[in-house]
Amino acid sequence: YQARTHIRHPKASLSDAEIQKGEIDQDYCYWAGDAVVYDDPAHGKILQMLWTGVEPGSLKNIDGCLREYSLEGEPGDGQYMSVLSTDYNFKSDGLGYGSTMFEDTEGGHIYLYTTKQVNLVSRVLVARTETLDLGSPWSYYIRDLSGDYHWQSSVPSNEEMERSYIT
């Protein structure tokens, strides 16, 4: 349903005419993250997909995007997989949570994982949604100065992340 493996980043430099000719943005782009199917009371079943914006050259995470697609109808008709919404400013912290997810349907949360490179080792961090909707508020699993883990609503600082790696 999409002819390309990514959606266009708002900072991408190619013109619409260049894209129509088949060119692909080589500077700013989004990489596909994970996705979930959410039963939205207003729209029925929707596919919620996280996209990670990457910086040209370094491929460093710089921002995020949440795009929602309709799952109403049947494959091949005009409504199925049509775009319902796109939030280009979604979780624009550049931390990349959601490259891998776990849906805890019994607990009512989606757990979102990211990694942070420390020398030659990738360290794991985790966040979770308040509900089974990716657009609901997120909490971040951090270890406080006493060594105890808990969930906090604010994005962790670099110091909090360093204390909170999951091993």
Which residues does each predicted region cover?
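Conserved beta-strand position repeated once per blade in WD40 beta-propeller domains
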Residues: 32-34, 98-100
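Beta-rich carbohydrate-recognition and catalytic domains
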Residues: 1-28, 37-93, 104-167
